[in-house]
Amino acid sequence: MHFLKEIIDILNEDLGWELHDVVAEGAYGQYELDFGYTDILQMADRFVFLRVLLKEIAKKHGYFVTFMPKTNISDWRSGAHINHSVASIKTGNSNIYKDGENFSDKAYNAVAGILKHGAAITALALSLIHI
């Protein structure tokens, strides 16, 4: 599919985002794109930019992109999920566990931040209207 090939080339070759996986989701035309790690602010910027980029490239190829969890009553539903990773920016190592078993303070802080900002994350990433 020329649309996906162009997106993959732009993200990896032009932008250097380290796209490492494109997975077909449950319904026709649904895909999950998985990127290399970066800090949270840069990933948020990439997320917003990616939505605009996908819509523009799709339009160029005669397609329409939506991020709605479900586009109509009879269609397969979207997973409408966001994957999170907690890792050191300096080393890239996971810092979720402090001793291999118990959560670290950083892991608790990450979860607290997600819970505190859950409404905003949902509004931006899992919108019910087409944006």
Where in the sequence are the language-model features?
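Glycine-rich, acidic/polar active-site loops that bind/position phosphate-bearing ligands
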Residues: 1-128
